[in-house]
Amino acid sequence: MRIENLQNENRKYAKSIGNFHVLEYVQDASVSPMNAMNEYFMSKMNVRRRQVVIDIDKDHSAIIQAGSMQWMGGNVQATSGVKGIGDFLGKALKGAVTKETAVKPEYVGEGCLVLEPTYKYIILADVGKWGSAGMTIEDGMFLACDANVKSKVVARKNLSSAVLGSEGLFNLSLQGNGVAALESNVPEDELIEVILENDELKIDGNLAVCWSSNLEFTVERSTKTLVGSAVSGEGLVNVYRGTGRVLMCPVAPTTSLFESTNSMAAKAAAKSSNTFGK
């Protein structure tokens, strides 16, 4: 099988890592006179449709979020990845607590797999570079990964981080060697990468997109005393300790695409955060 014009003047690979590619539409050419102006300015502001393209062969199979496949070419088949009723129940529980689909199909064979288009921003992450413990991601970010990458649910180590941290009780952790495609509410170049070496990072609000799974995450007062916190007006902060990496979004909360890209909604969503709410 040969695809002649997957890339052209209007469709280009914006980023590639290994057998994963981000196909970006420079502009939406399928417009009417009613929406042409909106589509024009959307393109200028980098609001574009994007698709993940995955090359499948004997050395590379892929696991994707259920329902995200648009088309596939070549000798590519989907398998459920479910090994029995116990495995299905375990995956259903994992999906319920991480806002992901219960069963993520695995695609094997030889050919090309293309996922549904999205206006979200696609981050291609080399999971192996996050260390042996892997990376923990925000709920709902997972889109696809190499089959060599294993996923598991990690729980908060203490009650404070779960109840007060606005990050949920459980998150999805990815571990192994391979590429993961993540859906982000903001562009990758707006994210700040913080490298910790036996150090700590304090963040006011749910701004962390993903972090090394071996980092200790707690919620603490910004100062040592209640009086100090009250006077400073900072209150509680999310604290990441240890050695690893954190990707954070300093311009908007990570809760939804609408809240991240609409300034008024961002302020409303983060009204308890000094960064955006005041």
Model-identified regions with their sequence ranges:
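Composition-driven recognition of glycine/serine/threonine/acidic- and proline-rich low-complexity segments
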Residues: 1-278
